[in-house]
């Protein structure tokens, strides 16, 4: 499998072209967990798969977190994918990239610099209910609770149905401990 390892503002990302659909979608999470593991493989913060466009973009980008879960978007990754798209002839200096969060526009500023226009947030609901591990929590304002494996604030977007998220940064996992140092 050919890949590019890219870096955008401190995030290191792996990019793979799968416009030919050579790898079944259900295989990606296992592949991603394996290749993103630091010290044991290539290691990366995230993984992007380039696919054929489906709704008017130059190409489609699927973003995955290093644990294999699909994410909607990564701004630093969007700039990387624009450079990849330009350098591989998928798009010109101005390009439209399809993401699960919507269409993103990217511009080539110079040889190494790319700018992106991320899509606007649709709406935010500051109250609601979240079910985590069988317990229901009511939210009144956005908060991140380290003892709860969830973010109690949802951004509603027409491109993605509301669903409980199960994978979070290790700092917010209920079983993690984050030291502050001496």
What are these regions (language model features)?
Residues 1-110, 148-182:
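A glycine-rich beta-to-alpha transition motif near the start of alpha/beta enzyme domains, typified by
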Residues 120-145:
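Active-site glycine-rich loop that binds ribose-phosphate moieties when present
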Residues 65, 99, 118, 132-134:
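Short acidic, glycine-rich loop/turn motifs
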Residues 115-117, 138-140, 149-153:
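Active-site-proximal beta-strand elements of phosphoester/diester hydrolases
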Residues 104-121, 125:
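A structural-propensity feature for long, helix-poor, extended segments
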